[in-house]
Amino acid sequence: MESGNERISSQSQGTIHLSKEPTFLIQQATLPSDLHSTLLQETQCGGLTKNIKANTQKRRPGTVILSKRSSRIMSETQPRPPVIPSRRPGFRICYICGREFGSQSLAIHEPQCLEKWRTENSKLPKHLRRPEPSKPQPIGGTDSHSLQAANEEAFQSAQAQLLPCENCGRTFLPDRLLVHQRSCKPKGENPGPPSMGSSNVPTGLKKASSGIPARPRTLICYICGREFGTLSLPIHEPKCLEKWKIENDQLPRELRRPQPQKPQPLPAGQSSQEGASQAALVPCPNCGRTFAVDRLPVHQRSCKSQPSGPKTSNSNIERKGGPNPPTNSKQQRNMEAPNGDKVTGVI
């Protein structure tokens, strides 16, 4: 009996112990189930992600197949890119230079561009000058078609200002054509007939057939033969003539020259200015070479003359290797001494 009571008491104590900590036991009892549920959720999520990855991997080749469709199908399904217009909408073209400007900027630009065009056109040779471009008449309406028509007319007006190169045929603006022709050489010997008659132009005014001035236009002074600009020559000639008179008066009478006359342009195309400058040259009385009046005295200092007059024959003999007078005093004494003295001297 006692042993049975002890067993009952031990069982009751165990139940009391269990009743004292019900939460701990409940947690111990519930932990395995929670872990199981969480593990199930994780495995389910992992399976879903694997399925999603597998599905995406399976779907990717489909996109590649879609990109390899024919161009016809692609053009039907995909949207077409927008068409960019050739010119910016709302901009107007200058009828002089062909550049684009806004509607408000064009009204400010056109007077300045026309003034610049007139200045550059006046600097060109006469055969390259162009008539002043006329502004096209405005077309009624404000739609895009009327603006495009006005721009097309202005563009054609600007293109009409271009000039073709005589050598290569390319077109340029008149002021740029001169720059181009400096490096564009003609292919043949005679690229084309010159527009300006070179026969009526003196050597100082001769230019290339293309009208490119390699240097500023010059004229030759009929007194001294030097070249001067077209504006500088009228200032130089009176001073040069006054200087010539002073220098001519200082010369001896036999060397004085008549006053040079200003030549008139010759119709045959001869260089009258060069002839006048050559006529103003004075020949040297010793050697016959011609010099300017002020340079002749400088030349005569080295080209000495004898008092009897010009001795051209002796000078010619000397040039040909004729007998020259002995310059050494010892040689001169030997030549003056008799032959017998020379023999006795040698013996």
From Swiss-Prot:
Amino acid composition bias (Polar residues), ranges on this chain: 303-316
Ligand binding (Zn(2+) 2): 165, 168, 180, 184
Region feature (Disordered): 124-145, 183-210, 255-277, 298-347
Domain of life: Eukaryota
InterPro entries on file: ZC2HC1A/B-like, Znf_C2HC_C3H
Residues annotated as binding Zn(2+) 3: 221, 224, 236, 240
GO molecular function, one term: zinc ion binding
Assigned keywords, A-Z: Metal-binding, Repeat, Zinc, Zinc-finger
UniProt binding sites for Zn(2+) 4: 284, 287, 299, 303
Zinc finger (C2HC/C3H-type): 90-119, 161-190, 217-246, 280-309
Cofactors required: Zn(2+)
Stored Gene3D superfamilies: Classic Zinc Finger
Binding site for Zn(2+) 1: 94, 97, 109, 113
Protein name, UniProt field: Zinc finger protein 474
Organism, scientific name: Mus musculus
Gene giving rise to this polypeptide: Znf474
